[in-house]
Amino acid sequence: FMSQEIYSKLYLALLRSLQKKSTKVAVMQQNQNFWAMQGLEHHGIIGGSDSFTIIGVSGIGKSSAISRAITLITERKLIEVEETQSKIIPCVMVQCPFDSSVKGLLLNVLHKVDEEIGSNYYENAIRVRATVDMLIGNVSQVALNHIGLLIVDEIQNVCNSKQGKSLVGMLTQLINNSGISICMVGTPESAVFFESAMQLARRSLGLQYQAMEYNHDFQHICKVLYSYQYTKKHTEITDTMIEWLYEHSAGIVSVVVALIHDAQEIAILNGKEELNLESLNEAYQKRFSLLHGYLEPTIKKGKQTTNRRKATTTSTTISEVIENTVVK
């Protein structure tokens, strides 16, 4: 469902952006952007497009879903417009600088465009030592002519930076001066930042995803992953093992993949050649110590679940117990 929702969001955002590029207002905005590049007074008149966020826990597959969606949406890397002899890049993906540098992000956008269409916008900007205001005009013009959808990954970098609000403000100005859609991708940490002010929250409405719940989908993923065994002794996955994987991964798929992979690696190296709870626990203790602080709450819930199940006389399925624990 996440992949379908992300695909739909990106597709519609790209469509809205492309529809504006051949309008009269777009030509008027090009003139305004030219004045901005000269350091003169200018106005954003095209506007009308949108910015949105895709926020989710690290490791749940956001970037993979976005990459697949972009591949499906853009069968060709470039859209060539015969009437204007111009080239449009459907999706440009950049990373938010670690220090939330406005100038760094703008130059990164120009560099990405140069790589795709063979232009020299980046070199020109460096040569003339363009100021931030001039760069905003330059990137707005480039985006209006050559970019359909701009995706800014690792947006959570704005949270702990003094320039965070300035960078988001720059993206807002870029929307108003170019008419393109901008998607910001990050972790739940960035949601707290955007919720701190109304103008930020309004610009960041979008999709939010959490780690998986203990349900049929999680069980199915575990069974599929467990089938890829490279040890000499083949074992079958049990409900207890699936429960253990959930408790020690917090429902994050990438952690489950890493646990099963490292457990097999350890089992092969120590000669036991068997994927079981012993090898999984050894992998967790030796290879995932840095994650223990994040996964401990889930493990404690799992222990409470086990104790409660032993104390009760009624028969309760594992999925129901875990589901009740997660709800509480």
Residue ranges and their predicted role:
Residues 42-67:
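Walker A/P-loop nucleotide-binding motif
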Residues 27-37, 43-47, 101-108, 116-164, ...:
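Mid-core helix/loop region of P-loop NTP-binding domains shared across ATPases and GTPases
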Residues 67-71, 257:
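The feature captures the helix immediately C-terminal to the Walker
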Residues 139, 159, 169-236, 240:
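The catalytic "switch" region of P-loop NTPases
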Residues 215-216, 223-328:
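C-terminal alpha-helical "lid" subdomain
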Residues 78-97:
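Conserved catalytic segments around the Walker B and adjacent sensor/switch elements
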Residues 72-83, 115-118:
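Post-Walker A helix-loop "phosphate-sensing" segment adjacent to the P-loop in P-loop NTPases
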Residues 1-49, 281, 285-328:
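A short, basic N-terminal segment
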